[in-house]
Each structure stands twice: as C-alpha cells, then as structure tokens.
C-alpha cells in the first residue's frame, strides 16, 4: 500500500515535470478514450438539439388562449384551426386537434387532446434515454479503462521479476487514471444536461395541461350564453 501511495505521488510529479500535452494524455489512455470522445460528441449533439427543440416548443403567443376563446365563442372554428396551425407548437397542435373534434362528445374531444399531448411529449423526450445512458455509462467505461490499465501495470511489474520500478509503476498509474477522468468529464455534463432537459419538459407539460383545461372550459361557454 505504501508503495502504491508513493507511486501515486511520483505519478503526479512526473506528469507535472513532463508537461504532457492533453493530446498525449488522451492518446495514452488507449482505445477507450476514443469511445468516450464519441460519447462526448453524442452528448453535445443531443443536448443542443433537444435544447433548441424545447425552446421552440415553449414559444407561444401570450394571448393564444384568449384568441382561441374569441374564435370559439364567435363560432369561427376554421379560423381558430388556422390560427393553431400557424402557431405550430405542441400546445397549438393539441388545441387544433380538439377543435377538429368539435361536434363530437366531450369525452372524444378530450381523448383526442390527450393523445396529441402524449405524442408531443414523446417527441420532446426523443434522445433523452440515450443521454441518461451516457451519464451512467461513461464513468463506468472510464473506470474499466483504469482497471485494465492497472492490470497491465502489475503485469509489467510481474514480468520485471518482482522488482518494483517506481517510475514504471507511477507512469502506468497516471496513464490508467486518464480514462477515469475522461469518463467523468463526459458523464457529469451528460447527467446535469439530462436533468435540465427533463425539468424543461416537465414545465412544458404543466403548461400543456393548463391550456387543455382552459380549452375544455371554453367549449362550455357558448352553451351558457
């Protein structure tokens, strides 16, 4: 154990003294570093693409439901459908489907709205399972690389005839630890990115539910007048 601690200290000293570049560290990490690099690229792509998609989905005219109410009360259903089609957001498409079902039982209208809402949420969540998998899998891949590197180091020590070469041991240790660092660099942003996107989607789902309730209330207004 003492020798391992000494090797770890020597590894830090060697890395600092040698001033190894990031590329050299990456290359010494082995083929698993290329896997982590690929996962990092996938993480960035999914996060940016989903962020933009959710940002677009949340854009909605603040007077949207007021205008829908005016159209419905005035009996201008076609104009209301055209307005929803023009807005082209998950909430608008949900209300548009409800407008297209007017004249049918209220339960059918509500079911149509719920079906569209479920479909829209499913679209928004596209790619999130992959992001969650990367968040959990990247650190494990990094740890696997470290374990393989340590096994290789001890095999080299064994082949050296039992003589502990601190330089060999320390060199193998810091190279092996590179994959753990790489796994965390990929996994941590993926974890926070996933939770951030999930929170944004949940907020949008709440707005969709609120607008759905408001729309169903609007449908009852003409009958009361």
Describe each PLM feature range.
Residues 2, 6-63:
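Hydrophobic membrane-targeting segments
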Residues 30, 44, 80, 95, ...:
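Residue-level signature of catalytic and energy-coupling elements of molecular machines
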Residues 33-46, 132-139, 186-190:
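Alpha-helical transmembrane segments of integral membrane proteins
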Residues 48-53, 188-200:
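Alpha-helical transmembrane segments of multi-pass membrane proteins
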Residues 58-144, 148-163, 192-225:
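Predominantly long cytosolic amphipathic alpha-helical stalk/bundle segments
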Residues 162-170:
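Short juxtamembrane loops and helix-capping segments at transmembrane helix boundaries
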Residues 173-192:
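Hydrophobic alpha-helical transmembrane segments of polytopic membrane proteins
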């Amino acid at each position: 154990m003492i020798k391992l601690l000494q090797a770890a200290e020597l590894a830090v000293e060697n890395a600092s003294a040698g001033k190894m570049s990031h590329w050299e560290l990456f290359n010494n990490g082995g083929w698993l570093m290329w896997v982590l690099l690929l996962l990092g690229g996938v993480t960035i792509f999914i996060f940016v693409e989903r962020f933009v998609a959710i940002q677009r989905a949340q854009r909605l005219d603040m007077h949207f439901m007021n205008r829908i109410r005016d159209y419905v009360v005035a009996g201008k259903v076609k104009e209301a459908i055209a307005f929803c089609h023009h807005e082209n957001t998950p909430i608008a498409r949900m209300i548009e489907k409800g407008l297209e079902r007017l004249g049918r039982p209220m339960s059918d209208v509500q079911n149509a709205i719920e079906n569209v809402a479920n479909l829209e949420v499913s679209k928004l969540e596209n790619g999130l399972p992959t992001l969650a998998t990367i968040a959990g899998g990247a650190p494990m891949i990094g740890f696997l690389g470290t374990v393989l590197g340590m096994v290789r180091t001890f095999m080299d020590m064994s082949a050296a005839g039992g003589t502990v070469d601190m330089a060999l041991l320390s060199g193998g240790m810091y190279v092996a630890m590179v994959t753990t660092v790489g796994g965390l660099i990929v996994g941590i942003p993926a974890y926070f990115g996933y939770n951030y996107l999930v929170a944004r989607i949940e907020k949008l789902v709440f707005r969709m539910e609120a607008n759905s309730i408001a729309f169903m209330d609007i449908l009852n207004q003409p009958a009361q007048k």
